[in-house]
């Protein structure tokens, strides 16, 4: 029986490439000369450093731009906290969203059931498994979810025939 999983995970390789490109652009830009502005990745979070609020905003804009060019959805990042570290220097932490929250998974299951497509959806941890009789039904379900769910970037993997 054909099936696939609905997940919410960024491509970590592309995210790392976007971070490296951001740091390279920041080091080469004239308006960042002599500043300690950079982007670091620690486990499941990104840490942005800037000399002041304006430069921190510029670092964030550069990162978002590079993520968009590498097809990494910005909705994977959730602003956590901004703090002052010594003098005027600022640090912002952004959490990387991995996995579907329970409320989002319930919404996905409800959308699938309300659509009357002949598929079954079951919540399995931080993913939703969708199984159906025909491949076309699964593809129709994918299109429906892409259209209906806008608050989180959904991905589809483990497509089995």
From Swiss-Prot:
Keywords: Nucleotide-binding
Annotated signal sequence range: none
A single Gene Ontology CC term: cytosol
UniProt xrefs under Gene3D superfamilies: 3.30.70.860, YajQ-like, domain 2 (3.30.70.990)
Classification via Pfam families: DUF520
Record bears the keyword Nucleotide-binding: yes
Highest taxon, organism lineage: Bacteria
Keyword Methyltransferase among UniProt keywords: no
GO MF annotation terms: nucleotide binding
Family: Belongs to the YajQ family.
HAMAP family, alphabetized: YajQ
PANTHER family, alphabetized: UPF0234 PROTEIN YAJQ (PTHR30476:SF0)
Described purpose of this protein according to its UniProt entry: Nucleotide-binding protein.
Name of the protein in its database record: Nucleotide-binding protein Pnuc_0290
């Amino acid at each position: 029986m054909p099936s696939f999983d609905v997940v919410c995970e960024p491509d970590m390789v592309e995210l790392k490439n976007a971070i490296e490109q951001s740091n390279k652009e920041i080091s080469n830009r004239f308006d960042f000369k002599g500043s300690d502005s950079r982007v670091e990745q620690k486990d499941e979070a990104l840490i942005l450093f800037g000399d002041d609020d304006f430069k921190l905003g510029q670092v964030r804009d550069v990162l978002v731009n590079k993520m968009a060019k590498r097809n990494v959805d910005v909705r994977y990042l959730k602003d956590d906290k901004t703090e002052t570290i010594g003098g005027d220097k600022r640090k912002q932490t952004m959490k990387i969203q991995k996995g579907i929250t329970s409320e989002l998974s319930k919404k996905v299951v409800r959308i699938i059931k309300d659509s009357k497509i002949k598929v079954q959806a079951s919540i399995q941890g931080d993913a939703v498994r969708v199984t159906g009789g025909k491949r076309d039904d699964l593809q129709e379900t994918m299109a429906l979810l892409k259209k209906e769910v806008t608050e989180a970037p959904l991905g589809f993997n483990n497509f089995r025939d």
